[in-house]
């Protein structure tokens, strides 16, 4: 509420402010998560998404390929998904192998995994430590998306 006061002489009148301005607080910041509770990475201009999931106990990285809505699996025929991560200030490359998910058609996979890599075990403790780029070929087109955590 806003109120103003001042002196204007003998015949001053006081008028209370009856209308206030309501200001809404912004909604709390929410991270975008995919159907497997992982971090979403945009591929192309919302054409596809990659969902990056990290299991801290096993140090296993899983990338799910999702459709434009980031809700449904999108099985692809890629041999792998390339991941470049920044570890100790250096860019390191990793390949995640296809592990077809339930319902993926023969010869295609919507899930790609990397388990037991010593560099990941030593340096990545949770999802927030993942900084880098996902690279994948879907159909005949190459896609790249940044893993970034906005706070």
Language-model segments: what does each one mean?
Residues 5-151:
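Intrinsically disordered, low-complexity terminal tails/loops enriched in metal-binding residues
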């Amino acid at each position: 509420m806003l109120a103003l006061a001042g002196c204007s002489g003998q015949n001053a009148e006081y008028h209370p402010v009856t209308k206030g301005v309501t200001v809404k607080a912004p909604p709390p910041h929410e991270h975008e998560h995919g159907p497997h509770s992982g971090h979403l990475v945009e591929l192309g201009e919302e054409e596809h998404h990659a969902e990056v999931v990290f299991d801290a106990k096993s140090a296993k990285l899983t990338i799910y390929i999702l459709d434009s809505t980031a809700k449904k699996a999108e099985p692809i025929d890629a041999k792998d998904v390339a991941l470049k991560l920044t570890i100790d200030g250096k860019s390191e490359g990793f390949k995640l192998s296809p592990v077809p998910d339930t319902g993926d058609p023969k010869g295609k996979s919507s899930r790609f995994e990397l388990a037991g890599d010593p560099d990941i075990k030593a340096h990545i403790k949770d999802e927030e430590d993942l900084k880098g780029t996902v690279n994948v070929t879907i159909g005949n087109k190459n896609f790249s998306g940044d893993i970034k955590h906005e706070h």
